[in-house]
Protein backbone atom coordinates (compact mmCIF):
# COMPACT_ATOMS: atom_id res chain seq x y z
CA UNK A 1 0.00 0.00 0.00
CA UNK A 2 1.66 3.22 0.11
CA UNK A 3 1.44 2.49 1.62
CA UNK A 4 0.73 -0.89 2.30
CA UNK A 5 1.93 -3.95 1.05
CA UNK A 6 0.17 -6.62 -0.28
CA UNK A 7 2.25 -8.16 -0.99
CA UNK A 8 0.14 -5.80 -2.03
CA UNK A 9 -0.76 -3.58 0.12
CA UNK A 10 -0.86 -0.16 0.03
CA UNK A 11 2.18 1.52 -1.37
CA UNK A 12 1.73 -0.14 -2.31
CA UNK A 13 1.22 -3.26 -2.24
CA UNK A 14 -1.40 -5.55 -2.98
CA UNK A 15 -4.50 -7.08 -1.62
CA UNK A 16 -4.57 -9.28 1.26
CA UNK A 17 -6.42 -12.05 2.90
CA UNK A 18 -5.35 -13.12 6.33
CA UNK A 19 -6.20 -15.25 9.31
CA UNK A 20 -4.14 -14.90 12.45
CA UNK A 21 -3.38 -17.31 15.23
CA UNK A 22 -4.79 -14.88 17.77
CA UNK A 23 -7.99 -14.48 15.81
CA UNK A 24 -8.35 -18.25 15.56
CA UNK A 25 -7.99 -18.63 19.30
CA UNK A 26 -10.43 -15.90 20.24
CA UNK A 27 -12.97 -16.71 17.59
CA UNK A 28 -12.68 -20.48 17.46
CA UNK A 29 -16.43 -20.95 17.57
CA UNK A 30 -16.87 -18.87 14.45
CA UNK A 31 -14.15 -20.24 12.21
CA UNK A 32 -13.07 -23.49 10.61
CA UNK A 33 -9.44 -24.03 11.56
CA UNK A 34 -6.87 -24.99 8.96
CA UNK A 35 -5.64 -28.36 10.08
CA UNK A 36 -1.91 -28.33 9.32
CA UNK A 37 -1.71 -24.61 9.01
CA UNK A 38 -3.85 -23.47 11.93
CA UNK A 39 -0.90 -21.85 13.71
CA UNK A 40 0.30 -19.99 10.63
CA UNK A 41 -0.87 -16.54 9.62
CA UNK A 42 -2.40 -16.77 6.18
CA UNK A 43 -2.25 -13.84 3.84
CA UNK A 44 -3.18 -12.91 0.35
CA UNK A 45 -1.64 -9.56 -0.36
CA UNK A 46 -0.96 -7.57 2.78
CA UNK A 47 0.27 -9.72 5.59
CA UNK A 48 -0.83 -10.09 9.16
CA UNK A 49 2.23 -10.95 11.22
CA UNK A 50 1.83 -13.42 14.05
CA UNK A 51 4.48 -16.12 14.36
CA UNK A 52 7.73 -15.10 16.03
CA UNK A 53 10.52 -17.69 15.93
CA UNK A 54 14.27 -17.73 15.60
CA UNK A 55 16.06 -19.22 12.63
CA UNK A 56 17.54 -21.85 14.89
CA UNK A 57 14.15 -22.72 16.31
CA UNK A 58 12.69 -22.90 12.85
CA UNK A 59 15.35 -25.37 11.70
CA UNK A 60 14.91 -27.38 14.90
CA UNK A 61 11.14 -27.56 14.49
CA UNK A 62 11.42 -28.74 10.93
CA UNK A 63 13.98 -31.36 11.84
CA UNK A 64 12.02 -32.53 14.86
CA UNK A 65 8.52 -32.50 13.39
CA UNK A 66 8.84 -32.80 9.65
CA UNK A 67 12.30 -34.32 9.49
CA UNK A 68 15.00 -33.72 6.89
CA UNK A 69 16.06 -36.41 4.47
CA UNK A 70 19.74 -37.01 3.82
CA UNK A 71 19.82 -34.75 0.79
CA UNK A 72 18.15 -31.87 2.63
CA UNK A 73 20.47 -32.31 5.60
CA UNK A 74 23.51 -32.34 3.32
CA UNK A 75 22.35 -29.15 1.60
CA UNK A 76 21.75 -27.47 4.93
CA UNK A 77 25.20 -28.49 6.14
CA UNK A 78 26.73 -27.14 2.95
CA UNK A 79 25.06 -23.76 3.44
CA UNK A 80 26.29 -23.65 7.02
CA UNK A 81 29.84 -24.56 5.99
CA UNK A 82 29.96 -21.96 3.21
CA UNK A 83 28.74 -19.33 5.65
CA UNK A 84 31.42 -20.27 8.19
CA UNK A 85 34.19 -20.31 5.58
CA UNK A 86 33.33 -16.93 4.10
CA UNK A 87 32.73 -15.37 7.50
CA UNK A 88 36.07 -16.51 8.93
CA UNK A 89 38.50 -17.19 6.06
CA UNK A 90 37.70 -14.67 3.33
CA UNK A 91 40.61 -12.24 2.94
CA UNK A 92 38.38 -9.22 3.59
CA UNK A 93 36.32 -8.91 6.74
CA UNK A 94 32.68 -9.74 6.04
CA UNK A 95 29.50 -8.78 7.85
CA UNK A 96 27.82 -11.91 9.17
CA UNK A 97 24.46 -10.18 8.93
CA UNK A 98 25.00 -9.32 5.27
CA UNK A 99 26.14 -12.85 4.44
CA UNK A 100 23.07 -14.28 6.14
CA UNK A 101 20.75 -11.88 4.36
CA UNK A 102 22.39 -12.57 1.00
CA UNK A 103 21.88 -16.30 1.46
CA UNK A 104 18.22 -15.86 2.33
CA UNK A 105 17.67 -13.35 -0.49
CA UNK A 106 19.20 -15.83 -2.91
CA UNK A 107 16.84 -18.60 -1.86
CA UNK A 108 13.80 -16.35 -2.08
CA UNK A 109 14.86 -14.96 -5.46
CA UNK A 110 15.19 -18.50 -6.80
CA UNK A 111 11.45 -18.96 -6.20
CA UNK A 112 10.75 -16.41 -8.97
CA UNK A 113 7.66 -15.44 -7.00
CA UNK A 114 6.67 -11.75 -6.74
CA UNK A 115 4.75 -12.46 -3.54
CA UNK A 116 7.64 -14.05 -1.61
CA UNK A 117 10.14 -11.78 0.10
CA UNK A 118 12.57 -11.52 3.02
CA UNK A 119 12.39 -8.30 5.03
CA UNK A 120 15.05 -6.92 7.35
CA UNK A 121 14.16 -5.55 10.77
CA UNK A 122 13.89 -2.04 9.36
CA UNK A 123 11.81 -3.20 6.42
CA UNK A 124 9.56 -5.22 8.71
CA UNK A 125 8.99 -2.16 10.87
CA UNK A 126 7.98 -0.19 7.80
CA UNK A 127 5.81 -3.07 6.68
CA UNK A 128 4.03 -3.20 10.03
CA UNK A 129 3.40 0.52 9.89
CA UNK A 130 2.00 0.08 6.41
CA UNK A 131 -0.61 -2.46 7.46
CA UNK A 132 -1.67 -0.61 10.61
CA UNK A 133 -4.50 1.24 8.87
CA UNK A 134 -3.31 4.77 9.64
CA UNK A 135 -0.25 6.17 7.96
CA UNK A 136 1.13 9.19 6.14
CA UNK A 137 1.51 8.55 2.44
CA UNK A 138 -0.28 8.72 -0.89
CA UNK A 139 -2.72 5.84 -0.48
CA UNK A 140 -1.72 3.62 -3.39
CA UNK A 141 -1.85 -0.16 -3.15
CA UNK A 142 1.18 -1.68 -4.88
CA UNK A 143 2.93 -4.96 -5.52
CA UNK A 144 6.24 -6.09 -6.97
CA UNK A 145 5.78 -8.10 -10.14
CA UNK A 146 8.42 -9.09 -12.69
CA UNK A 147 10.91 -6.81 -10.92
CA UNK A 148 8.53 -3.87 -11.35
CA UNK A 149 6.56 -1.94 -8.75
CA UNK A 150 2.98 -1.96 -10.00
CA UNK A 151 -0.04 -0.17 -8.59
CA UNK A 152 -2.81 -2.58 -7.67
CA UNK A 153 -5.22 0.22 -6.95
CA UNK A 154 -5.36 3.72 -5.50
CA UNK A 155 -7.51 3.99 -2.38
CA UNK A 156 -10.76 5.83 -2.81
CA UNK A 157 -10.38 9.54 -2.11
CA UNK A 158 -6.63 9.23 -1.61
CA UNK A 159 -4.00 11.69 -2.87
CA UNK A 160 -2.90 9.02 -5.36
CA UNK A 161 -6.40 8.68 -6.81
CA UNK A 162 -6.84 12.45 -7.02
CA UNK A 163 -3.53 12.72 -8.84
CA UNK A 164 -4.68 10.24 -11.48
CA UNK A 165 -2.78 7.12 -10.40
CA UNK A 166 -4.52 4.03 -11.83
CA UNK A 167 -4.41 0.23 -11.38
CA UNK A 168 -1.49 -1.43 -13.19
CA UNK A 169 0.51 1.81 -13.42
CA UNK A 170 4.21 0.97 -13.08
CA UNK A 171 6.32 3.20 -10.83
CA UNK A 172 9.82 3.65 -12.26
CA UNK A 173 11.19 6.54 -10.19
CA UNK A 174 10.55 8.26 -6.86
CA UNK A 175 11.65 11.89 -6.68
CA UNK A 176 13.63 11.44 -9.87
CA UNK A 177 15.62 8.44 -8.61
CA UNK A 178 15.25 5.05 -10.25
CA UNK A 179 13.75 2.32 -8.06
CA UNK A 180 15.01 -0.49 -10.28
CA UNK A 181 16.11 -3.42 -8.15
CA UNK A 182 14.62 -2.03 -4.96
CA UNK A 183 12.44 -4.15 -2.69
CA UNK A 184 8.81 -3.21 -2.26
CA UNK A 185 9.42 -2.06 1.32
CA UNK A 186 12.23 0.23 0.22
CA UNK A 187 9.96 1.87 -2.33
CA UNK A 188 7.26 2.23 0.32
CA UNK A 189 9.73 4.00 2.57
CA UNK A 190 10.70 6.35 -0.26
CA UNK A 191 7.09 7.16 -1.09
CA UNK A 192 6.15 7.86 2.50
CA UNK A 193 7.29 10.90 4.42
CA UNK A 194 6.08 13.74 6.56
CA UNK A 195 2.53 15.01 6.31
CA UNK A 196 1.95 17.83 3.78
CA UNK A 197 5.23 17.17 1.96
CA UNK A 198 5.27 16.21 -1.72
CA UNK A 199 6.63 13.19 -3.57
CA UNK A 200 7.06 12.90 -7.33
CA UNK A 201 6.41 9.51 -8.92
CA UNK A 202 7.46 8.68 -12.45
CA UNK A 203 4.63 6.55 -13.79
CA UNK A 204 4.79 4.24 -16.78
CA UNK A 205 1.46 3.45 -18.42
CA UNK A 206 1.83 1.42 -21.57
CA UNK A 207 4.91 2.70 -23.40
CA UNK A 208 4.73 6.22 -21.98
CA UNK A 209 6.11 7.79 -18.82
CA UNK A 210 4.94 10.83 -16.90
CA UNK A 211 5.89 12.55 -13.64
CA UNK A 212 3.08 12.83 -11.10
CA UNK A 213 3.47 15.10 -8.07
CA UNK A 214 1.47 13.98 -5.04
CA UNK A 215 1.06 15.61 -1.63
CA UNK A 216 1.41 13.21 1.27
CA UNK A 217 -1.47 13.08 3.71
CA UNK A 218 -2.49 11.15 6.78
CA UNK A 219 -4.41 8.20 5.41
CA UNK A 220 -7.17 6.48 7.33
CA UNK A 221 -8.75 3.57 5.56
CA UNK A 222 -12.48 3.71 6.13
CA UNK A 223 -14.04 0.33 5.53
CA UNK A 224 -17.63 0.92 4.52
CA UNK A 225 -19.68 3.86 3.27
CA UNK A 226 -23.42 3.85 2.68
CA UNK A 227 -25.44 6.18 0.47
CA UNK A 228 -29.02 6.12 -0.73
CA UNK A 229 -29.36 6.83 -4.44
CA UNK A 230 -33.04 6.92 -5.30
CA UNK A 231 -34.41 3.44 -4.68
CA UNK A 232 -30.96 1.86 -4.60
CA UNK A 233 -28.62 1.60 -1.63
CA UNK A 234 -24.95 1.91 -2.57
CA UNK A 235 -22.52 0.38 -0.08
CA UNK A 236 -18.89 1.10 -0.87
CA UNK A 237 -16.43 -1.32 0.70
CA UNK A 238 -12.90 0.09 0.58
CA UNK A 239 -11.00 -2.67 2.36
CA UNK A 240 -11.49 -5.85 4.36
CA UNK A 241 -10.18 -4.94 7.82
CA UNK A 242 -11.17 -5.56 11.42
CA UNK A 243 -14.96 -5.33 11.83
CA UNK A 244 -15.65 -4.54 8.19
CA UNK A 245 -18.28 -7.26 8.43
CA UNK A 246 -19.92 -5.37 11.29
CA UNK A 247 -19.86 -2.16 9.29
CA UNK A 248 -21.38 -3.93 6.29
CA UNK A 249 -24.10 -5.44 8.47
CA UNK A 250 -24.94 -1.98 9.82
CA UNK A 251 -25.09 -0.59 6.29
CA UNK A 252 -27.43 -3.37 5.14
CA UNK A 253 -29.68 -2.77 8.15
CA UNK A 254 -29.68 0.95 7.37
CA UNK A 255 -30.72 0.22 3.78
CA UNK A 256 -33.48 -2.05 5.06
CA UNK A 257 -34.67 0.66 7.43
CA UNK A 258 -34.73 3.06 4.47
CA UNK A 259 -37.08 0.64 2.72
CA UNK A 260 -34.62 -0.31 -0.01
CA UNK A 261 -34.80 -3.68 -1.77
CA UNK A 262 -31.89 -3.18 -4.15
CA UNK A 263 -28.30 -2.95 -2.94
CA UNK A 264 -25.06 -2.30 -4.80
CA UNK A 265 -21.89 -3.50 -3.10
CA UNK A 266 -19.16 -1.39 -4.69
CA UNK A 267 -15.83 -3.24 -4.51
CA UNK A 268 -14.01 -1.29 -7.21
CA UNK A 269 -10.37 -0.67 -6.35
CA UNK A 270 -10.75 -2.70 -3.15
CA UNK A 271 -7.36 -4.42 -2.72
CA UNK A 272 -8.59 -6.98 -0.20
CA UNK A 273 -7.83 -7.58 3.46
CA UNK A 274 -8.67 -10.13 6.13
CA UNK A 275 -9.96 -13.51 5.05
CA UNK A 276 -11.99 -13.84 8.25
CA UNK A 277 -13.83 -10.65 7.39
CA UNK A 278 -14.52 -11.84 3.84
CA UNK A 279 -16.06 -15.01 5.26
CA UNK A 280 -18.14 -13.11 7.84
CA UNK A 281 -19.30 -10.67 5.17
CA UNK A 282 -20.34 -13.48 2.87
CA UNK A 283 -22.19 -14.98 5.84
CA UNK A 284 -24.47 -11.92 5.87
CA UNK A 285 -25.93 -13.21 2.60
CA UNK A 286 -25.08 -16.93 2.67
CA UNK A 287 -26.58 -19.39 5.15
CA UNK A 288 -24.78 -21.31 7.88
CA UNK A 289 -22.49 -24.21 6.97
CA UNK A 290 -21.73 -23.11 3.41
CA UNK A 291 -18.20 -23.06 2.01
CA UNK A 292 -16.98 -19.54 1.24
CA UNK A 293 -13.45 -20.35 0.10
CA UNK A 294 -11.24 -23.40 -0.36
CA UNK A 295 -7.55 -23.36 0.54
CA UNK A 296 -5.46 -25.84 -1.40
CA UNK A 297 -1.88 -27.06 -0.97
CA UNK A 298 -0.83 -30.03 -3.03
CA UNK A 299 -3.47 -32.70 -2.52
CA UNK A 300 -4.79 -31.13 0.68
CA UNK A 301 -7.87 -28.92 0.54
CA UNK A 302 -9.55 -27.16 3.45
CA UNK A 303 -12.93 -25.45 3.23
CA UNK A 304 -13.67 -22.35 5.27
CA UNK A 305 -17.38 -22.17 5.99
CA UNK A 306 -19.97 -19.78 7.34
CA UNK A 307 -20.86 -20.24 11.00
CA UNK A 308 -24.09 -18.26 11.41
CA UNK A 309 -27.46 -17.87 9.76
CA UNK A 310 -27.67 -15.25 7.03
CA UNK A 311 -28.98 -11.82 8.03
CA UNK A 312 -32.76 -12.02 7.70
CA UNK A 313 -33.03 -8.41 6.52
CA UNK A 314 -30.73 -9.25 3.58
CA UNK A 315 -32.59 -12.34 2.37
CA UNK A 316 -35.14 -10.48 0.26
CA UNK A 317 -32.70 -7.95 -1.11
CA UNK A 318 -31.57 -7.84 -4.73
CA UNK A 319 -27.78 -7.73 -4.43
CA UNK A 320 -25.45 -6.40 -7.13
CA UNK A 321 -21.66 -6.36 -6.87
CA UNK A 322 -19.65 -3.78 -8.80
CA UNK A 323 -15.99 -4.64 -9.53
CA UNK A 324 -13.07 -3.60 -11.71
CA UNK A 325 -9.42 -4.52 -12.31
CA UNK A 326 -8.53 -3.02 -8.93
CA UNK A 327 -10.78 -5.47 -7.06
CA UNK A 328 -8.41 -8.07 -5.67
CA UNK A 329 -7.80 -10.79 -3.11
CA UNK A 330 -10.47 -10.78 -0.39
CA UNK A 331 -12.69 -8.78 -2.76
CA UNK A 332 -12.49 -11.71 -5.15
CA UNK A 333 -13.11 -14.27 -2.39
CA UNK A 334 -16.27 -12.41 -1.37
CA UNK A 335 -17.42 -11.83 -4.95
CA UNK A 336 -16.67 -15.40 -6.00
CA UNK A 337 -18.67 -16.84 -3.11
CA UNK A 338 -21.78 -14.73 -3.70
CA UNK A 339 -21.55 -15.37 -7.43
CA UNK A 340 -21.23 -19.15 -7.03
CA UNK A 341 -24.26 -19.27 -4.73
CA UNK A 342 -26.27 -16.98 -7.03
CA UNK A 343 -26.70 -14.51 -4.19
CA UNK A 344 -25.54 -11.58 -6.29
CA UNK A 345 -25.12 -10.47 -9.87
CA UNK A 346 -21.70 -9.10 -10.76
CA UNK A 347 -21.30 -5.94 -12.86
CA UNK A 348 -18.36 -3.91 -14.13
CA UNK A 349 -15.11 -5.25 -15.52
CA UNK A 350 -12.87 -8.24 -14.83
CA UNK A 351 -11.21 -8.31 -11.40
CA UNK A 352 -7.46 -8.31 -10.68
CA UNK A 353 -6.96 -12.07 -10.35
CA UNK A 354 -4.97 -12.98 -7.22
CA UNK A 355 -5.52 -16.54 -6.08
CA UNK A 356 -2.45 -17.45 -4.04
CA UNK A 357 -1.88 -17.28 -0.30
CA UNK A 358 1.18 -16.11 1.58
CA UNK A 359 2.39 -17.10 5.03
CA UNK A 360 4.66 -14.97 7.21
CA UNK A 361 7.31 -15.93 9.73
CA UNK A 362 8.73 -13.16 11.90
CA UNK A 363 12.08 -13.96 13.47
CA UNK A 364 13.37 -13.01 16.89
CA UNK A 365 15.66 -10.35 15.42
CA UNK A 366 12.65 -8.56 13.93
CA UNK A 367 13.14 -9.69 10.34
CA UNK A 368 10.41 -11.46 8.44
CA UNK A 369 9.98 -14.08 5.73
CA UNK A 370 6.91 -14.01 3.53
CA UNK A 371 6.33 -16.86 1.12
CA UNK A 372 3.52 -18.32 -0.97
CA UNK A 373 2.20 -21.48 0.65
CA UNK A 374 -1.11 -22.29 -0.98
CA UNK A 375 -3.77 -21.17 -3.40
CA UNK A 376 -7.46 -20.46 -2.91
CA UNK A 377 -10.51 -21.42 -4.94
CA UNK A 378 -14.13 -20.30 -4.99
CA UNK A 379 -16.84 -22.60 -3.54
CA UNK A 380 -17.37 -24.17 -6.98
CA UNK A 381 -13.65 -24.73 -7.37
CA UNK A 382 -12.78 -21.86 -9.70
CA UNK A 383 -9.12 -20.81 -9.61
CA UNK A 384 -9.03 -17.14 -10.58
CA UNK A 385 -5.29 -16.43 -10.28
CA UNK A 386 -4.12 -14.44 -13.28
CA UNK A 387 -7.62 -14.62 -14.74
CA UNK A 388 -9.83 -12.62 -12.45
CA UNK A 389 -13.61 -12.92 -12.15
CA UNK A 390 -15.61 -11.94 -15.19
CA UNK A 391 -18.75 -9.92 -14.48
CA UNK A 392 -22.19 -11.21 -15.41
CA UNK A 393 -22.82 -7.87 -17.07
CA UNK A 394 -19.95 -5.78 -18.41
CA UNK A 395 -20.14 -2.04 -17.89
CA UNK A 396 -17.32 -0.42 -19.79
CA UNK A 397 -15.35 2.35 -18.21
CA UNK A 398 -15.63 5.60 -20.24
CA UNK A 399 -12.83 5.94 -22.80
CA UNK A 400 -11.38 9.01 -21.14
CA UNK A 401 -10.86 7.08 -17.90
CA UNK A 402 -8.79 4.43 -19.69
CA UNK A 403 -6.43 6.72 -21.59
CA UNK A 404 -2.67 6.28 -21.43
CA UNK A 405 -0.66 9.12 -19.94
CA UNK A 406 0.57 11.53 -22.61
CA UNK A 407 4.29 12.26 -22.03
CA UNK A 408 4.77 15.89 -21.12
CA UNK A 409 8.18 15.88 -22.78
CA UNK A 410 6.55 15.95 -26.21
CA UNK A 411 4.75 18.74 -28.06
CA UNK A 412 2.18 17.93 -30.75
CA UNK A 413 1.16 20.28 -33.56
CA UNK A 414 -0.58 20.36 -36.95
CA UNK A 415 0.82 17.74 -39.30
CA UNK A 416 1.91 15.30 -36.59
CA UNK A 417 0.77 11.68 -36.69
CA UNK A 418 1.00 9.93 -33.32
CA UNK A 419 -1.09 7.56 -31.19
CA UNK A 420 -1.13 10.16 -28.41
CA UNK A 421 -3.10 12.48 -30.68
CA UNK A 422 -6.00 10.05 -30.52
CA UNK A 423 -5.79 10.32 -26.73
CA UNK A 424 -5.92 14.12 -26.98
CA UNK A 425 -9.05 13.93 -29.11
CA UNK A 426 -10.85 11.51 -26.80
CA UNK A 427 -9.95 13.62 -23.76
CA UNK A 428 -11.02 16.93 -25.31
CA UNK A 429 -14.29 15.36 -26.40
CA UNK A 430 -14.93 14.19 -22.82
CA UNK A 431 -14.27 17.75 -21.64
CA UNK A 432 -16.92 19.13 -23.99
CA UNK A 433 -14.87 20.24 -26.99
CA UNK A 434 -16.01 19.49 -30.54
CA UNK A 435 -13.94 16.66 -31.97
CA UNK A 436 -15.33 14.90 -35.03
CA UNK A 437 -12.88 11.97 -35.26
CA UNK A 438 -10.49 9.86 -33.20
CA UNK A 439 -7.68 9.49 -35.72
CA UNK A 440 -3.99 9.86 -34.93
CA UNK A 441 -3.71 12.93 -37.19
CA UNK A 442 -3.22 16.40 -35.72
CA UNK A 443 -5.39 18.37 -38.17
CA UNK A 444 -6.56 21.97 -38.35
CA UNK A 445 -9.81 21.15 -36.56
CA UNK A 446 -7.89 19.77 -33.59
CA UNK A 447 -5.64 22.81 -33.50
CA UNK A 448 -8.73 25.01 -33.22
CA UNK A 449 -10.03 22.97 -30.28
CA UNK A 450 -6.63 23.04 -28.56
CA UNK A 451 -6.64 26.83 -28.91
CA UNK A 452 -10.13 26.96 -27.41
CA UNK A 453 -8.98 24.77 -24.53
CA UNK A 454 -5.95 26.97 -23.91
CA UNK A 455 -8.01 30.14 -23.99
CA UNK A 456 -10.64 28.76 -21.62
CA UNK A 457 -7.98 27.68 -19.14
CA UNK A 458 -5.93 30.89 -19.41
CA UNK A 459 -2.93 29.24 -21.03
CA UNK A 460 -0.76 30.68 -23.77
CA UNK A 461 -2.79 30.20 -26.97
CA UNK A 462 -0.49 28.45 -29.46
CA UNK A 463 -2.62 25.66 -30.86
CA UNK A 464 0.15 23.26 -29.91
CA UNK A 465 -0.38 20.56 -27.31
CA UNK A 466 2.62 21.37 -25.11
CA UNK A 467 3.66 20.54 -21.53
CA UNK A 468 1.50 23.21 -19.86
CA UNK A 469 -1.53 22.24 -21.94
CA UNK A 470 -0.94 18.56 -21.18
CA UNK A 471 -0.76 19.15 -17.42
CA UNK A 472 -4.05 21.08 -17.37
CA UNK A 473 -5.65 18.52 -19.69
CA UNK A 474 -4.72 15.68 -17.32
CA UNK A 475 -5.82 17.62 -14.24
CA UNK A 476 -9.29 18.30 -15.68
CA UNK A 477 -9.81 14.70 -16.80
CA UNK A 478 -8.92 13.42 -13.33
CA UNK A 479 -11.27 15.96 -11.78
CA UNK A 480 -14.06 14.87 -14.10
CA UNK A 481 -13.51 11.20 -13.31
CA UNK A 482 -13.66 11.91 -9.57
CA UNK A 483 -16.84 13.98 -9.82
CA UNK A 484 -18.83 11.82 -12.22
CA UNK A 485 -19.11 8.09 -11.60
CA UNK A 486 -20.39 7.03 -15.01
CA UNK A 487 -20.10 3.29 -14.31
CA UNK A 488 -22.13 3.46 -11.09
CA UNK A 489 -24.71 5.70 -12.78
CA UNK A 490 -25.11 3.14 -15.57
CA UNK A 491 -25.60 0.34 -13.05
CA UNK A 492 -28.23 2.29 -11.12
CA UNK A 493 -30.08 2.96 -14.37
CA UNK A 494 -30.01 -0.77 -15.12
CA UNK A 495 -31.48 -1.53 -11.70
CA UNK A 496 -34.34 0.96 -11.98
From Swiss-Prot:
GO CC annotations on file: outer membrane-bounded periplasmic space; plasma membrane
Start and end residues of each PDZ domain: 124-206
Annotated segments matching region Disordered: 1-27
Signal peptide: none
Membrane topology recorded in Swiss-Prot or TrEMBL: Single-pass membrane protein
UniProt cross-references to InterPro entries, sorted A to Z: ClpP/crotonase-like_dom_sf (IPR029045), CtpA/B_N (IPR055210), PDZ (IPR001478), PDZ_6 (IPR041489), PDZ_sf (IPR036034), Peptidase_S41A (IPR004447), Peptidoglycan-bd-like (IPR002477), PGBD-like_sf (IPR036365)
One GO MF term attached to the UniProt entry: endopeptidase activity
Regions that span the bilayer: 39-59
Catalytic activity, EC: 3.4.21.-
Residues forming the catalytic site: 329, 340, 354
Biological process according to GO: proteolysis; signal transduction
Basic and acidic residues bias: start-end ranges: 1-16
Keywords annotated in UniProt: Cell membrane, Hydrolase, Membrane, Protease, Serine protease, Transmembrane, Transmembrane helix
Subcellular location(s) per record: Cell membrane
Enzyme class (EC, first level): hydrolase
Compositional bias segments (type: Polar residues): 18-27
Family: Belongs to the peptidase S41A family.
Protein name as it appears in the record: Probable CtpA-like serine protease
Organism of origin: Staphylococcus aureus (strain bovine RF122 / ET3-1)
